[in-house]
Swiss-Prot record:
One of its GO terms (biological process) is tricarboxylic acid cycle. Forms oxaloacetate, a four-carbon dicarboxylic acid source for the tricarboxylic acid cycle. SUPFAM superfamilies: Phosphoenolpyruvate/pyruvate domain. PROSITE patterns: PEPCASE_1. This is Phosphoenolpyruvate carboxylase. Its EC number is 4.1.1.31. Belongs to the PEPCase type 1 family. The lineage of its organism: Bacteria, Bacillati, Chloroflexota, Chloroflexia, Chloroflexales. One of its GO terms (molecular function) is phosphoenolpyruvate carboxylase activity. Keywords: Carbon dioxide fixation, Lyase, Magnesium. The active site is at H151, K591. Its cofactor is Mg(2+). It catalyses: oxaloacetate + phosphate = phosphoenolpyruvate + hydrogencarbonate. The gene is ppc. PANTHER family: PHOSPHOENOLPYRUVATE CARBOXYLASE (PTHR30523:SF6). It comes from Roseiflexus castenholzii (strain DSM 13941 / HLO8).
Length: 938
């Protein structure tokens, strides 16, 4: 499928026209809402932003600084509001452009699979000789699970998301043949939405609660995902059927969704066991309400009469059983729909769902109670699916296959994927919290006076013994410290949820900072005490280690080997189907050792985990904890999947959908479809196409690059005493920590140490201050030293040979190419001139100048070396769409940075001044605007 320069020019012109149209409407709204003077101020700053890049930069810089210093806080707020609105509209225009390009290509090449689509993956598998039986075996146990997370720096509110969705629909209408009144009416509706946006608080006035974050996450399920999933399965079935026409395909529900909102309590004291229960109730209600609406619609469609077409005996028996559960409904149906048995069945399903919904909202989940769902209510997805399959089999056996494969089949797919719980909630907690809780419990029980003083071997022996001991360790009534009570109550809440409310609502306990086998045995003991684990009988909760520092990634297989030597852990794993989930943390590893070293540590860890699984015959399910920003493992998801080590994915994978990129990936239904199909495409190809491990020469080169990069990164971040003050003073980290952005604190502990700072605000702060340091620092030094000072990195050959080696790796090794391209992208979003203005916020200018000089030198080195390795003249020459997008945004981003710097200066100079609250509001607006403009947060 060719994409000619003519096509690209047409697409670029259409995008420019859309942005111009929206920008003109926004200008009119600014005049109308804020006045002509405000409009002229915005225009002057925008003009200076352009001159800063393309005209007289020194003069523009001086005037921008002078104007920022003289503006009132009220004027600054209006300007930032205008730029925020512009970025929202530009982002929407770019999203719609992607929609239109996809649609144009489908229209132009209807018989050619879209690149990176499901059909393209199946065609490639067929071309490579992969037999249908191999694909079927892969599908039978496949699990692809995107996991939605909240994000402390995601400032978009649900009300804004809904307005953007309406704007998207209106913009899409303009691609049709609109004339006269209809076109004018469309323009007025768009303007109406822009006015409404202008008059709406675009960021939160009060700090969001965890439940607010759950509601925000549910928006994407309710507004698109429920409807989207059946189409994706139809596309997969069609691709398989047409490419392998002789095989009878079974396509199980390989796609499932997960969530962290309400379950991730690591470092967030606001996520309590009661909040987790509330989140589960909300997600269960969302799924059930959606199924009720779907079954009502299905009832309208299934009006077949037994006088016209027979039904199965199985359906009649099912209806008789339903009538015994709902006699009043049965009487009503006998009068109203005596011959329409499918409608009768739909009515009973609806009644069961309503009863299930009532129970989900009101059921007591106190631990230790023996309540169960009322008669006629569904408990699991299987119960609902059993009823739906009864109708399906009856239709299939009575000449109505086309009906069975319509709306009913769609509802079956929705029930398979979303069940009665929408998404499976992960429970994440720091290993130290489990350790501290057990130390108190063991001491109180007289088992061990000081558990924390034990070495790893002693801990393992003690925990194994206690797990195997049938006597309760923890009494029913909890008389411990509040922290310990909360840890125990969390496991008890999970037990109550799984036993009495929703058996699929929670599946995994993720243990942050796992360092040894005892860190997995500790929650297993707590699970046993809550009734979630009975050796040799059942285990209802998987234990997933999270390896997130460079050192922990390096020994990840050793930790699991230690677990496998323990009979009690092997028994737990057997009860979980010999599936071992392991989460790999991209964020903290990057903060720990730097971008390049973290990428390589993660790659190596995956190879070790792959080999571990093969040695023990265990299905490994790797959970990739990627952030949206490059400094936290971000970038295109499908490219990242294909860049993983050969054989490391298999057919099971979990990937985080971080809060800050969910809106971009799932905000519009067609883009959500595109994102999910790209993920499925990548997992199919990575799991089924044979790939060899990279040559030793390449891996040896990466070993050297990683070591050099880590050394250079840590020399700046951890070994210079003046670095932490620089970071605290020249970025808005202090303000980000205080403002109403997310429910979670910015640090795990109340310290100034980089080690204790969460990775998200770490990356976010550098992005806001235009340094973007976590996404590239150390890489330039490593590349340059490897190529031009080979003797320092033990590399052989000449500089020309070593550069040629890196160029070959870039061309032929997807892992290395993705690593370089992601760094290139984040370098393209950096601006060291504006970063130098942030550096002026530091009280100690001599120390700040020294730090900034090191950062600038590394930026120049990284830019230069990446251009050489990728064989391009300018950064992003090989990504022109992104390059143009950045160029289009800079005239608006740059003035906002100047205004943010001025606001930070004023707030820090007079933290208790009369304008304190207004300045904080303006800073929050600027944070939101810069995040939208840069299209990266944390």
């Amino acid at each position: 499928m060719s994409h000619t320069p003519h096509n690209r020019r047409h697409e670029s012109e259409r995008l420019s026209a859309t942005i111009r149209f929206l920008g003109n409407l926004l200008g009119d709204v600014i005049r109308e809402q804020a006045g002509e003077a405000a409009f002229q101020l915005v225009e002057r700053l925008r003009t200076l932003g352009k001159e800063l890049r393309n005209g007289a930069p020194d003069r523009a810089d001086a005037e921008l600084r002078m104007m920022a210093a003289r503006m009132t806080v009220a004027d600054i707020q209006i300007v930032i509001k205008a730029f925020n609105a512009y970025f929202l509209l530009v982002n929407l225009a770019e999203q719609m452009q992607r929609v239109w390009v996809l649609r144009d290509r489908e229209r132009k090449y209807p018989d050619t699979p879209r690149p990176e689509s499901i059909a393209a993956a199946i065609a490639e598998l067929h071309a490579c000789g992969i037999p249908a039986t191999t694909i079927q075996e892969w599908l039978d146990t496949a699990c692809i699970q995107p996991v939605f997370t909240a994000h402390p720096t995601e400032a978009r509110r649900r009300t804004a998301l809904e307005k953007v969705r309406r704007l998207a629909t209106l913009l899409d209408e303009r691609t049709g043949d609109l004339h006269g009144f209809v076109r004018e009416e469309n323009t007025m509706r768009i303007r109406e939405e822009i006015v409404s946006l202008w008059q709406t608080d675009e960021v939160r006035v009060v700090k969001p609660t965890v439940i607010d974050e759950v509601k925000n996450g549910m928006f994407y399920f309710e507004s698109g995902l429920f409807d989207l999933i059946p189409r994706l399965y139809r596309e997969l079935e069609y691709a398989l059927r047409t490419t392998y026409p002789t095989h009878e395909w079974r396509v199980p529900p390989l796609l499932r969704y997960g969530a962290w909102m309400g379950g991730d309590r690591d470092g967030n004291p606001n996520v309590t066991h009661t909040v987790t229960i509330q989140a589960v109730r909300m997600m269960r209600a969302a799924a059930i309400e959606r199924h009720i609406a779907a079954v009502e619609e299905l009832s309208h469609r299934l009006g077949q009469s037994v006088r016209q077409a027979p039904v199965s005996d199985e359906l009649r028996e099912s209806l008789a059983h339903d009538a015994s559960l709902f006699p009043e409904v049965a009487d009503m149906l006998a009068r109203r729909n005596p011959y329409e048995l499918y409608r009768q069945k739909c009515t009973y399903i609806r009644e069961k769902l309503i009863r299930t919904l009532d129970y989900a909202r009101t059921a007591s989940l106190d631990w230790g109670r023996s309540d169960s769902p009322p008669k006629g209510a569904y408990f699991s997805r299987t119960d609902l699916l059993d009823d739906l399959h009864v109708m399906e089999r009856s239709l299939l056996s009575n000449n109505a296959a086309i009906v069975a494969n319509g709306a009913l089949r769609d509802l079956i797919r929705q029930a398979e994927v979303f069940g009665l719980h929408t998404a499976t909630l992960d429970i994440r907690q720091h290993s130290e919290r489990h350790t501290a809780a057990l130390a108190e419990v063991l001491a109180a029980a007289g088992v061990c006076a000081d558990y924390t003083a034990l070495n790893e071997i002693e801990r393992i022996e003690l925990l194994s013994r206690e797990i195997e001991n049938p006597r309760p360790l923890i009494p029913t009534r909890l008389d411990y410290s509040p922290d310990t009570v909360e840890v125990i109550a969390t496991f008890r809440a999970v037990a109550s949820i799984l036993e009495r409310l929703s058996p699929e609502a929670v599946e995994t306990c993720i243990v942050s900072m796992t360092r040894g086998a005892s860190d997995l045995l500790a929650p297993l003991l707590l699970a046993k005490e809550a009734g979630l684990f009975r050796p040799f009988r059942f285990s209802r909760l998987s234990m997933a280690p999270l390896f997130e520092t460079g050192a922990d990634l390096a020994c990840c297989d050793e930790v699991l080997e230690a677990c496998m030597r323990l009979p009690i852990y092997r028994n737990h794993l057997a009860l979980r189907g010999f599936v071992q989930e392991v989460m790999i943390g991209y964020s903290d590893s990057n903060k720990d050792v730097g971008y390049a070293a973290a990428n390589w540590a993660i790659y190596q860890a995956q190879r070790k985990l792959r080999d571990f699984g093969r040695r023990h015959g265990i299905q490994m399910r790797l959970f990739h904890g990627r952030g949206g920003a490059i400094g936290r493992g971000g970038g295109p998801a499908n490219h990242a999947i294909l860049a993983q080590p050969p054989g490391s994915i298999g057919n099971q994978i979990k990937i985080t959908e971080q809060g800050e990129v969910i809106a971009d990936r799932y905000g519009l239904p067609l883009l959500a479809h595109r994102h999910i199909e790209q993920v499925i495409n990548a997992v199919l190809r990575a799991g089924l196409l044979q790939r060899d491990d990279p040559p030793d020469e390449w891996t040896q080169a990466l070993e050297r690059l990683a070591a050099l990069s880590q050394r250079h990164y840590r020399a700046l971040v951890y070994e210079r005493s003046d670095f932490v003050p620089y970071f605290r003073n020249v970025t808005p980290i202090a303000e980000i920590s205080r403002l109403n952005i997310g429910s979670r604190p910015a640090s795990r502990r109340n310290t100034e140490r980089i080690e204790d700072l969460r990775a998200i605000p770490w990356v976010f702060s550098w992005m806001q201050s235009r340094h973007t340091l976590p996404g590239w620092y150390g890489l330039g030094f490593a590349l340059e030293t490897f190529v031009y000072a080979g003797e320092q990195s033990d590399a052989s050959g000449s500089a020309i040979d070593r550069l040629a080696l890196l160029q070959e790796m870039y061309a032929r090794w997807s892992f290395f190419r993705v690593m370089i391209d992601n760094a290139q992208m984040i370098l393209g979003k950096a601006d060291l001139h504006i970063a130098s203005r942030y550096a002026e916020l530091a009280p100690d200018q001599n120390a700040a100048a020294a730090i900034f000089a090191a950062i600038r030198e590394e930026y120049q080195r990284a830019s230069r070396m990446i251009r050489q390795v990728a064989r391009i003249e300018r950064l992003l020459d090989n990504a022109p769409v992104l390059q143009h997008s950045i160029q289009r945004r800079n005239p608006y981003i740059d003035p906002m940075s100047y205004l943010q710097i001025e606001l930070l200066r004023r707030l820090r100079a007079a933290p208790d001044g009369p304008d304190h609250a207004a300045i904080e509001d303006a800073i929050l607006l600027s944070i939101s605007g810069l995040a939208a403009g840069l299209m990266n947060t944390g």
